[in-house]
Amino acid sequence: ACPQRPVVTFTGDAGFWYHIAEVETAVRWKINSVTVVNNNGGGNQSKRGFDRAYGGEQTAQARELWTYNPMNFARLAEDMGALGIRVETPGEFAGALARALKADRPAIIDVVTDIEAIAPAAVS
């Protein structure tokens, strides 16, 4: 509808894994998009469920079900033809977003965050 305006998406790394092939699709179709990835190396929304499955405690078995090997999504984006920007400190984010918005091509902002920073449960 408005190809000159970028679509901005925020996702976690676990969710991004489900749709990572769409970066190549966006490059091929020249879709002006910016994807901000909260890259903490795990599917933190799943943590509590896996803990419950293992008796309510964080065990090595439970942890291996929701954590991932380290990934540089910015480098992966570049390999697919998109703009990849890695952000490792909060002060880098504003510049990264400005650069991505001006790119006029698919851009992935890979924001490295702390896996131990788990949001409070929305429901109990």
Label each region the model flagged.
Residues A1-S124:
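Thiamine diphosphate
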